[in-house]
Amino acid sequence: MTAIYKDAGRPVHERVADLLARMTPEEKFAQMHAYWLILDENGNHRERSDLSDEFAGVSEQAALSERLKLGVGQITRPLGTHIVDAKTGVRAANRLQRMMMEETRLGIPALFHEECLVGLLCKDATLFPSSLNY
């Protein structure tokens, strides 16, 4: 039987109520979180480390799939951290989205945030002119 939240024929308010009732507090918290990932030249994502890891007492990064097992609300800059071509970046983003939908308990897709104000910031993409103070 298909879960109500996955049934596109049901009213939105029913789907939302069903999904929220199924979610643990940890999964709800994960949906409010964003990960800024590093995409290497080979099209593989890894987590970006920063001082927050040090302040949190995290000595080593957990495997990305372990960190994302509860889901995540947003993936930040999935294509733009290193210079990659658009096809490599999109393939990597698709792999990551597939993981979110197939390997998490509820299969909630992530939102992707990429800088595109003057064009997609990746190798061989067109960037349009803009003023210095945009």
Predicted regions: what they are:
Residues 1-134:
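N-terminal beta-rich core of secreted/periplasmic extracellular enzymes
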